[in-house]
């Protein structure tokens, strides 16, 4: 779940605003019963995580891409036959979600939820990044997952094209199938879920941005 931004003072401001707009509290989403807010798990070295990357080149300048991204999460990550979508979120820290250290509960359409924290965001020249961690999964699809680390990197490659790169890395639970099988379990998780159902969700989100940015607005 999440988005990156870039380019000049105006472009960066719009992009960070777009990100925050998707994270405002929405009706009906609250912390789950018995929820206790603990610090996020320590992040393991990359060779202990299972990762997948998707990217898209959008034929529009950064500002137009930022405007296309300016919508709530529930309109970005929709329910599919394989995975739940987002139904809303609930802030755990003051202010909007986005600055490093901000946290919220993300509610899912299957009645479950996850906790998400911003780890880092920034911009330099024509590039920007946003990194975050997701844990406290309360959804059947995520039973084998201890936590996930996502990262968006956005680069304006010329005056009319912007590349968005999204990487998701998961740490599996050591005592639950398939993580209990070690390297074999990571492979099974990759080929059976990450490179299929989850990759399809990631592509759908990125293609949604591309379509929205490249479709002329009606007067």
Model-derived regions: residue spans:
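Bacterial N-terminal signal peptides that target proteins for export
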Residues: 1-9
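Hydrophobic ligand-binding cavity/cleft-lining segments
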Residues: 23-96
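Intrinsic-disorder/low-complexity, polar/charged segments enriched in Ser/Thr/Lys/Arg/Asp/Glu/Gln
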Residues: 49-57, 103, 113, 129, ...
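A short, structured loop/turn motif at beta-sheet edges
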Residues: 59-63, 119-128, 153-163, 214-216
């Amino acid at each position: 779940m999440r988005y990156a931004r870039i380019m000049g003072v105006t472009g960066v401001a719009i992009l960070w605003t777009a990100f925050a707009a998707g994270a405002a509290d929405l009706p009906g989403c609250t912390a789950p019963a018995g929820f206790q807010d603990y610090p996020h798990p320590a992040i393991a070295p990359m060779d202990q995580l299972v990762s997948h990357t998707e990217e898209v080149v959008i034929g529009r300048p950064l500002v137009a891409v930022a405007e296309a991204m300016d919508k709530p999460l529930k309109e970005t990550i929709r329910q599919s036959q394989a995975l739940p979508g987002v139904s809303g979120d609930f802030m755990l820290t003051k202010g909007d979600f986005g600055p490093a250290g901000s946290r919220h509960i993300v509610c899912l359409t299957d009645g479950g939820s996850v906790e998400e924290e911003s780890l880092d965001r920034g911009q330099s020249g024509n590039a920007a990044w946003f990194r975050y961690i997701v844990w406290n999964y309360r959804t059947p699809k995520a039973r084998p997952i201890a936590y996930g680390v996502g990262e968006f990197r956005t680069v304006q490659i010329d005056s009319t094209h912007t590349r968005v790169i999204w990487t998701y890395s998961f740490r599996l639970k050591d005592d639950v199938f398939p993580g209990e099988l070690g390297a074999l379990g990571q492979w099974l998780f990759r080929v059976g879920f990450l490179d299929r159902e989850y990759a399809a969700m990631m592509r759908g989100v990125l293609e949604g941005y591309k379509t929205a940015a490249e479709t002329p607005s009606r007067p």
